[in-house]
Protein backbone atom coordinates (compact mmCIF):
# COMPACT_ATOMS: atom_id res chain seq x y z
CA UNK A 1 0.00 0.00 0.00
CA UNK A 2 1.58 3.24 -1.15
CA UNK A 3 0.41 6.70 -0.03
CA UNK A 4 0.27 9.94 -1.99
CA UNK A 5 2.45 13.03 -2.42
CA UNK A 6 3.21 14.80 0.91
CA UNK A 7 1.30 12.09 2.77
CA UNK A 8 2.55 9.12 4.84
CA UNK A 9 1.49 5.72 6.12
CA UNK A 10 -0.76 7.61 8.54
CA UNK A 11 -3.31 8.00 5.76
CA UNK A 12 -4.17 4.30 6.15
CA UNK A 13 -4.93 4.31 9.90
CA UNK A 14 -8.67 3.78 9.36
CA UNK A 15 -8.02 0.98 6.86
CA UNK A 16 -5.26 -1.24 8.23
CA UNK A 17 -7.21 -3.03 10.98
CA UNK A 18 -10.21 -3.71 8.75
CA UNK A 19 -8.04 -4.94 5.88
CA UNK A 20 -6.07 -7.14 8.28
CA UNK A 21 -9.17 -9.26 8.78
CA UNK A 22 -8.85 -10.70 5.28
CA UNK A 23 -5.31 -9.91 4.08
CA UNK A 24 -1.88 -8.87 5.32
CA UNK A 25 -1.40 -5.14 4.70
CA UNK A 26 2.15 -4.01 3.92
CA UNK A 27 2.78 -0.27 3.67
CA UNK A 28 5.62 1.57 1.97
CA UNK A 29 6.52 5.26 2.12
CA UNK A 30 7.85 7.27 -0.79
CA UNK A 31 11.39 8.62 -0.73
CA UNK A 32 11.48 11.89 1.20
CA UNK A 33 8.31 10.99 3.10
CA UNK A 34 7.77 9.55 6.57
CA UNK A 35 10.53 7.18 7.61
CA UNK A 36 11.98 6.63 4.14
CA UNK A 37 15.40 7.98 3.12
CA UNK A 38 15.95 10.94 0.77
CA UNK A 39 18.66 9.99 -1.73
CA UNK A 40 20.52 12.83 -3.42
CA UNK A 41 20.55 10.95 -6.73
CA UNK A 42 17.43 11.95 -8.63
CA UNK A 43 17.37 8.62 -10.49
CA UNK A 44 16.12 6.91 -7.34
CA UNK A 45 12.88 8.85 -7.71
CA UNK A 46 12.05 7.77 -11.26
CA UNK A 47 8.89 5.64 -11.38
CA UNK A 48 10.82 2.75 -12.91
CA UNK A 49 13.14 2.70 -9.90
CA UNK A 50 10.13 2.53 -7.61
CA UNK A 51 8.99 -0.51 -9.60
CA UNK A 52 12.33 -2.16 -8.81
CA UNK A 53 11.95 -1.27 -5.13
CA UNK A 54 8.46 -2.77 -5.01
CA UNK A 55 9.74 -5.97 -6.56
CA UNK A 56 12.44 -6.17 -3.87
CA UNK A 57 9.75 -5.82 -1.22
CA UNK A 58 7.78 -8.68 -2.78
CA UNK A 59 10.88 -10.87 -2.77
CA UNK A 60 11.66 -9.94 0.83
CA UNK A 61 8.14 -11.00 1.78
CA UNK A 62 8.78 -14.33 0.09
CA UNK A 63 5.51 -14.28 -1.82
CA UNK A 64 5.07 -15.29 -5.44
CA UNK A 65 2.15 -12.94 -6.04
CA UNK A 66 0.27 -10.22 -4.21
CA UNK A 67 -2.28 -7.46 -4.39
CA UNK A 68 -0.97 -3.91 -4.68
CA UNK A 69 -2.76 -0.73 -3.68
CA UNK A 70 -1.91 2.90 -4.36
CA UNK A 71 -3.32 6.31 -3.56
CA UNK A 72 -2.91 9.30 -5.91
CA UNK A 73 0.80 9.52 -6.86
CA UNK A 74 1.30 6.20 -5.10
CA UNK A 75 -1.36 4.73 -7.41
CA UNK A 76 0.61 5.86 -10.45
CA UNK A 77 3.58 3.88 -9.11
CA UNK A 78 1.70 0.74 -8.09
CA UNK A 79 -0.18 0.78 -11.40
CA UNK A 80 3.13 0.93 -13.26
CA UNK A 81 4.39 -2.00 -11.22
CA UNK A 82 1.17 -3.90 -11.92
CA UNK A 83 1.47 -3.35 -15.67
CA UNK A 84 5.14 -4.32 -15.82
CA UNK A 85 4.95 -7.26 -13.38
CA UNK A 86 1.45 -8.52 -14.09
CA UNK A 87 2.61 -12.10 -13.54
CA UNK A 88 3.22 -11.17 -9.88
CA UNK A 89 0.02 -9.19 -9.32
CA UNK A 90 -3.21 -10.92 -8.31
CA UNK A 91 -5.03 -7.61 -8.40
CA UNK A 92 -4.46 -3.87 -8.20
CA UNK A 93 -6.45 -1.30 -6.22
CA UNK A 94 -6.10 2.40 -6.92
CA UNK A 95 -7.76 5.68 -5.98
CA UNK A 96 -8.17 8.87 -8.02
CA UNK A 97 -4.81 9.59 -9.62
CA UNK A 98 -4.41 12.41 -12.10
CA UNK A 99 -0.69 11.68 -12.25
CA UNK A 100 -1.33 8.06 -13.31
CA UNK A 101 -3.58 9.07 -16.18
CA UNK A 102 -1.90 12.36 -17.12
CA UNK A 103 -2.11 13.22 -20.80
CA UNK A 104 0.99 13.67 -22.93
CA UNK A 105 0.55 17.45 -22.87
CA UNK A 106 0.23 17.49 -19.07
CA UNK A 107 3.34 15.34 -18.69
CA UNK A 108 5.26 17.66 -21.00
CA UNK A 109 4.18 20.65 -18.92
CA UNK A 110 5.32 18.96 -15.72
CA UNK A 111 8.67 18.10 -17.28
CA UNK A 112 9.08 21.69 -18.42
CA UNK A 113 8.59 23.04 -14.90
CA UNK A 114 10.17 20.15 -12.97
CA UNK A 115 13.62 21.66 -12.41
CA UNK A 116 12.29 25.03 -11.29
CA UNK A 117 9.70 23.46 -8.98
CA UNK A 118 12.30 21.18 -7.43
CA UNK A 119 14.82 23.97 -6.99
CA UNK A 120 12.22 26.17 -5.29
CA UNK A 121 11.45 23.44 -2.75
CA UNK A 122 15.08 22.57 -2.11
CA UNK A 123 15.87 26.25 -1.51
CA UNK A 124 12.72 27.11 0.44
CA UNK A 125 12.72 24.03 2.67
CA UNK A 126 9.77 23.03 4.84
CA UNK A 127 8.14 26.46 4.63
CA UNK A 128 7.98 26.10 0.83
CA UNK A 129 6.60 22.56 1.16
CA UNK A 130 3.86 23.81 3.49
CA UNK A 131 2.65 26.19 0.77
CA UNK A 132 1.94 23.34 -1.66
CA UNK A 133 -1.88 23.02 -1.90
CA UNK A 134 -1.88 19.27 -1.16
CA UNK A 135 0.14 19.66 2.05
CA UNK A 136 -1.75 17.90 4.89
CA UNK A 137 -2.25 21.13 6.85
CA UNK A 138 -4.63 22.31 4.12
CA UNK A 139 -6.73 19.12 4.23
CA UNK A 140 -9.33 20.50 6.64
CA UNK A 141 -12.07 18.13 5.43
CA UNK A 142 -10.27 15.02 6.64
CA UNK A 143 -11.45 13.27 9.82
CA UNK A 144 -9.68 14.89 12.76
CA UNK A 145 -7.77 11.74 13.76
CA UNK A 146 -6.24 11.32 10.31
CA UNK A 147 -5.64 15.05 9.89
CA UNK A 148 -3.68 15.19 13.15
CA UNK A 149 -1.60 12.13 12.26
CA UNK A 150 -0.73 13.43 8.80
CA UNK A 151 0.12 16.88 10.11
CA UNK A 152 2.38 15.31 12.71
CA UNK A 153 4.17 13.26 10.03
CA UNK A 154 4.51 16.31 7.76
CA UNK A 155 7.52 17.52 9.78
CA UNK A 156 9.34 14.45 8.43
CA UNK A 157 9.00 15.63 4.83
CA UNK A 158 12.51 16.11 3.49
CA UNK A 159 13.12 19.08 1.14
CA UNK A 160 15.63 17.13 -0.98
CA UNK A 161 13.27 14.18 -1.23
CA UNK A 162 10.27 16.33 -2.12
CA UNK A 163 12.32 18.35 -4.61
CA UNK A 164 13.49 15.19 -6.35
CA UNK A 165 9.95 13.84 -6.37
CA UNK A 166 8.89 16.93 -8.33
CA UNK A 167 11.91 16.59 -10.61
CA UNK A 168 11.62 12.90 -11.45
CA UNK A 169 8.54 11.13 -10.07
CA UNK A 170 5.58 13.31 -10.99
CA UNK A 171 6.72 14.28 -14.52
CA UNK A 172 7.23 10.61 -15.45
CA UNK A 173 4.28 9.14 -13.55
CA UNK A 174 1.74 8.71 -16.36
CA UNK A 175 0.92 5.10 -17.20
CA UNK A 176 -1.27 5.76 -20.23
CA UNK A 177 1.11 3.96 -22.60
CA UNK A 178 1.17 0.94 -20.27
CA UNK A 179 -2.46 0.96 -19.16
CA UNK A 180 -3.79 0.22 -22.65
CA UNK A 181 -2.22 -3.25 -22.34
CA UNK A 182 -3.08 -3.88 -18.69
CA UNK A 183 -3.33 -7.61 -17.86
CA UNK A 184 -4.04 -7.57 -14.12
CA UNK A 185 -7.50 -7.24 -12.58
CA UNK A 186 -7.71 -3.62 -11.46
CA UNK A 187 -10.12 -1.70 -9.26
CA UNK A 188 -10.52 2.07 -9.27
CA UNK A 189 -12.16 3.35 -6.09
CA UNK A 190 -13.51 6.52 -7.66
CA UNK A 191 -14.11 9.45 -5.37
CA UNK A 192 -16.90 11.01 -7.40
CA UNK A 193 -16.76 14.44 -5.76
CA UNK A 194 -13.33 15.24 -7.23
CA UNK A 195 -14.47 16.85 -10.47
CA UNK A 196 -10.99 17.42 -11.86
CA UNK A 197 -10.45 13.65 -11.97
CA UNK A 198 -13.47 13.04 -14.21
CA UNK A 199 -11.51 13.36 -17.47
CA UNK A 200 -8.91 10.88 -16.22
CA UNK A 201 -11.63 8.50 -15.05
CA UNK A 202 -13.27 8.57 -18.47
CA UNK A 203 -9.93 7.89 -20.16
CA UNK A 204 -9.21 4.94 -17.87
CA UNK A 205 -12.72 3.54 -18.28
CA UNK A 206 -12.40 3.72 -22.06
CA UNK A 207 -8.81 2.59 -22.54
CA UNK A 208 -7.68 0.35 -19.66
CA UNK A 209 -8.59 -3.35 -19.99
CA UNK A 210 -9.53 -5.42 -16.93
CA UNK A 211 -10.53 -2.31 -14.97
CA UNK A 212 -13.63 -2.11 -12.83
CA UNK A 213 -14.75 1.13 -11.23
CA UNK A 214 -16.64 1.51 -7.97
CA UNK A 215 -18.17 4.89 -7.18
CA UNK A 216 -17.69 6.21 -3.66
CA UNK A 217 -19.24 9.51 -2.65
CA UNK A 218 -16.05 11.20 -1.51
CA UNK A 219 -13.37 13.52 -2.77
CA UNK A 220 -9.74 12.78 -3.56
CA UNK A 221 -9.12 11.28 -0.11
CA UNK A 222 -11.56 8.43 -0.69
CA UNK A 223 -10.05 5.91 1.76
CA UNK A 224 -9.87 8.56 4.50
CA UNK A 225 -13.25 10.22 4.00
CA UNK A 226 -15.19 6.98 3.51
CA UNK A 227 -13.01 4.27 5.10
CA UNK A 228 -15.78 1.72 5.64
CA UNK A 229 -16.93 1.87 2.02
CA UNK A 230 -13.33 1.70 0.82
CA UNK A 231 -12.53 -1.28 3.05
CA UNK A 232 -15.66 -3.17 1.98
CA UNK A 233 -15.00 -2.45 -1.68
CA UNK A 234 -11.44 -3.73 -1.40
CA UNK A 235 -12.59 -6.86 0.43
CA UNK A 236 -15.13 -7.67 -2.30
CA UNK A 237 -12.51 -7.15 -4.99
CA UNK A 238 -9.97 -9.40 -3.27
CA UNK A 239 -12.56 -12.16 -2.88
CA UNK A 240 -13.52 -11.87 -6.53
CA UNK A 241 -9.89 -12.04 -7.69
CA UNK A 242 -9.25 -15.08 -5.50
CA UNK A 243 -11.81 -17.04 -7.53
CA UNK A 244 -10.32 -16.16 -10.93
Model-derived regions, located:
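Active-site glycine-rich loops that stabilize anionic/oxyanionic intermediates
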Residues: 4-7, 72
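Active-site loop/oxyanion-hole signature of alpha/beta-hydrolase fold enzymes
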Residues: 13-17, 23-69, 73, 232-235
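Catalytic histidine-centered segment of alpha/beta-hydrolase-like enzymes
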Residues: 218-231
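Alpha/beta-hydrolase active-site loop signature
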Residues: 6, 30-34, 99, 219-222
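Conserved alpha/beta-hydrolase catalytic His-Asp/Glu region
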Residues: 103-109, 122-180
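Flexible "cap/lid" loop of the alpha/beta hydrolase fold
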Residues: 79, 83-84, 90-122
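Conserved loop-alpha-helix segment in the C-terminal half of the alpha/beta-hydrolase fold
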Residues: 183-218
Amino acid sequence: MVHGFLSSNAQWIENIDALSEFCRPVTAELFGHGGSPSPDDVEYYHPNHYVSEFEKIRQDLNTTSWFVCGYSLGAALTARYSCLHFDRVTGHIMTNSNSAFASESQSKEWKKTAKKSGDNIQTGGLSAIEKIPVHPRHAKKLPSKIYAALEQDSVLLNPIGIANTLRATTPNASIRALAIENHSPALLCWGTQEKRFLESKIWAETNMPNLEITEIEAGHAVNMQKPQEFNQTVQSFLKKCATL
